[in-house]
From Swiss-Prot:
GO terms for biological process: mRNA processing; mRNA splicing, via spliceosome; RNA splicing; RNA splicing, via transesterification reactions; U2-type prespliceosome assembly. GO terms for molecular function: RNA binding; splicing factor binding. Residues 13-91, 100-179 form the RRM domain. The modification N-acetylalanine is found at residue 2. Belongs to the SF3B4 family. It comes from Homo sapiens. The gene is SF3B4. Residues 207-424 are annotated as: Disordered. This is Splicing factor 3B subunit 4. Component of the 17S U2 SnRNP complex, a ribonucleoprotein complex that contains small nuclear RNA (snRNA) U2 and a number of specific proteins. Part of the SF3B subcomplex of the 17S U2 SnRNP complex. SF3B associates with the splicing subcomplex SF3A and a 12S RNA unit to form the U2 small nuclear ribonucleoproteins complex (U2 snRNP). SF3B4 has been found in complex spliceosome 'B' and 'C' as well. Component of the minor (U12-type spliceosome) spliceosome. Found in a complex with PRMT9, SF3B2 and SF3B4. InterPro entries: Nucleotide-bd_a/b_plait_sf, RBD_domain_sf, RRM_dom, SF3B4_RRM1, SF3B4_RRM2, SF3B4_spliceosome_assoc. Component of the 17S U2 SnRNP complex of the spliceosome, a large ribonucleoprotein complex that removes introns from transcribed pre-mRNAs. The 17S U2 SnRNP complex (1) directly participates in early spliceosome assembly and (2) mediates recognition of the intron branch site during pre-mRNA splicing by promoting the selection of the pre-mRNA branch-site adenosine, the nucleophile for the first step of splicing. It is linked to Acrofacial dysostosis 1, Nager type: A form of acrofacial dysostosis, a group of disorders which are characterized by malformation of the craniofacial skeleton and the limbs. The major facial features of AFD1 include downslanted palpebral fissures, midface retrusion, and micrognathia, the latter of which often requires the placement of a tracheostomy in early childhood. Limb defects typically involve the anterior (radial) elements of the upper limbs and manifest as small or absent thumbs, triphalangeal thumbs, radial hyoplasia or aplasia, and radioulnar synostosis.
Amino acid sequence: MAAGPISERNQDATVYVGGLDEKVSEPLLWELFLQAGPVVNTHMPKDRVTGQHQGYGFVEFLSEEDADYAIKIMNMIKLYGKPIRVNKASAHNKNLDVGANIFIGNLDPEIDEKLLYDTFSAFGVILQTPKIMRDPDTGNSKGYAFINFASFDASDAAIEAMNGQYLCNRPITVSYAFKKDSKGERHGSAAERLLAAQNPLSQADRPHQLFADAPPPPSAPNPVVSSLGSGLPPPGMPPPGSFPPPVPPPGALPPGIPPAMPPPPMPPGAAGHGPPSAGTPGAGHPGHGHSHPHPFPPGGMPHPGMSQMQLAHHGPHGLGHPHAGPPGSGGQPPPRPPPGMPHPGPPPMGMPPRGPPFGSPMGHPGPMPPHGMRGPPPLMPPHGYTGPPRPPPYGYQRGPLPPPRPTPRPPVPPRGPLRGPLPQ
């Protein structure tokens, strides 16, 4: 356990332990810091006259990461009722002091060094244990303390966040401490900040920087909608941040139909237009062999570019037109009825067209009436029909039932054997 020469030690993997009680020994110090990592050796300088240690020691670990971890978990724990101080024991530790020292006033007497360290270490690296000024006779706190940060960013954040906040039911005051041997000059001046920015040791070798000064995680890139490895949106989709294309008005060419094809015909009476004129191609009357250009290719399949609104104008099957002529007049012939069913012929002159056959599904449109004629009236109950009888109101008492009528008994057959007809 005895330490070798200082020149042979790994100063970066060695920690300083202060505030030790007189009962602490080197074996106890070894077992305590073994919880943080593999310990190479321990050393507690002793007085040559009394042979007692002087209240501090050194613990060398196998690696620098173990020393940083020991500083993180062992600093300010209580050993025999006294909080111990654990920090780096490197030879240039004093060069890390950039002057970011703050003063904390109006402290409650119950506040100790560990509470201050746990509270203010959230703002940055603390070089030394917080120093609470105490009465040398009684050991009671005088109500103020000092903390030395490793950077001005940490001290600025601590002053901004903690000044005026309540700690143990007392509002504390946090500000930069006065410099020693100076006339009212405080730390945190522009000259100190400039020297701290030019000091490479303050940025490269801070105590336990593995935990407090870890680099921030890289920000995730914004997701870009891509199609087949490019930054363009998929085909048919508008680019991000733009509005969808407007719906074309009735009669305009849809996007999927080439200009060479004739536009689909308009339904009768749509948009206030009347029937086509005599000079319009395909506007012949039924029975003259002229019909509208068929909007579907053979087989009843719609064109690939037609919209749902145009499909609805041509009927659910896409096999006819409202103005198509009767069978045999140039239009599409109707389907043959099943065997045993009458052939649905055209209605007589002046009669409304027939409705859908009985048993057809709801919503299935029947044949369109001729232009200018009204369809069949909606199904209404007969005049004077009031619906099914209503049940009697609650609490209604029925009258006495009439006595049952006596039913006549059947005649009793005669007793004895039946005789045949008497002889003449």
